[in-house]
């Protein structure tokens, strides 16, 4: 009975938000310096065989993540650095370009934009050239909130309308795209197992945007 009530509630909320306008987004840009631009352009070429003179993407996909801890401020400070920290050896061997995402959502559902949605961010191996990343403050021990579920659904709806998005996945699901036409990673051994943001979270977000018919597989 509890699951039925939850399903009905989320369905009603989903319908309600389908009728609303764009979500409130607070711009909080990280330092996208000329060095970061050049590292991003190099990454596009070396990992995707994409040669261009701008650090931009053509979004087809949205990938939801969690930060595995911290606050908006601590994660902002981390993403704001151009270079990866030395402890992340596996990633650093591929490029010194720091990880980042286009958006980060706080536990109360506040949405922050860290860069323009069509700017390149390193957040999902093999798919960064076409994927918008949304980070959520939380972890396995600090489950994501109902406010974040709602905010993610609003943001997904807004971005889908703006960029004609086709796919919505969680970071843990990105492996399904290996060996597909969308997967452009040039190093066949460059892959890491992820578990964020969790099946329950993805199911709830997908329920709220089910009318968009976004795919989760190639």
Go through the PLM ranges and name each one.
Residues 1-20:
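Bacterial Sec-dependent N-terminal signal peptides
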Residues 19-123:
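N-terminal catalytic cores of peptidoglycan-degrading enzymes
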Residues 19-38, 139-218:
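Basic/polar, cationic surfaces and motifs that engage anionic cell-wall
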Residues 50-51, 100-101, 136-145:
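Second-shell loop/turn segments in exported
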Residues 55-57, 96, 127, 141-149:
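Solvent-exposed, acidic/flexible segments
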Residues 60, 99, 130-132, 164:
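Envelope-exposed proteins and targeting segments
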Residues 68, 130, 135-141:
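Cell-envelope and extracellular/periplasmic
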């Amino acid at each position: 009975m509890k699951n039925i009530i939850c399903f009905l509630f989320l369905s009603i909320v989903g319908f309600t938000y389908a009728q609303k306008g764009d979500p409130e987004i607070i711009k909080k840009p990280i330092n996208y310096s000329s060095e970061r631009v050049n590292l991003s352009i190099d990454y596009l070429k070396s990992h995707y065989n994409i040669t261009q003179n701008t650090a931009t993407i053509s979004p087809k996909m949205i990938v939801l993540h969690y930060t595995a801890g911290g606050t908006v401020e601590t994660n902002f400070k981390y993403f704001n650095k151009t270079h990866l920290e030395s402890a992340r050896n596996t990633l650093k061997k591929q490029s010194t370009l720091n990880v980042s995402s286009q958006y980060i959502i706080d536990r109360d559902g506040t949405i922050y934009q860290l860069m323009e949605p069509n700017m390149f961010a390193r957040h999902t191996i093999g798919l960064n050239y076409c994927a918008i990343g949304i980070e959520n403050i939380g972890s396995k021990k600090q489950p994501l909130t109902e406010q974040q579920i709602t905010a993610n659904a609003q943001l997904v709806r807004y971005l889908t309308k703006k960029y004609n998005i086709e796919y919505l996945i969680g970071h843990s699901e990105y492996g399904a795209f290996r060996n597909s036409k969308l997967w452009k990673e040039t190093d066949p051994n460059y892959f890491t197992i992820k578990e964020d943001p969790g099946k329950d979270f993805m199911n709830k977000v997908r329920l709220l945007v089910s009318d968009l018919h976004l795919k989760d597989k190639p």
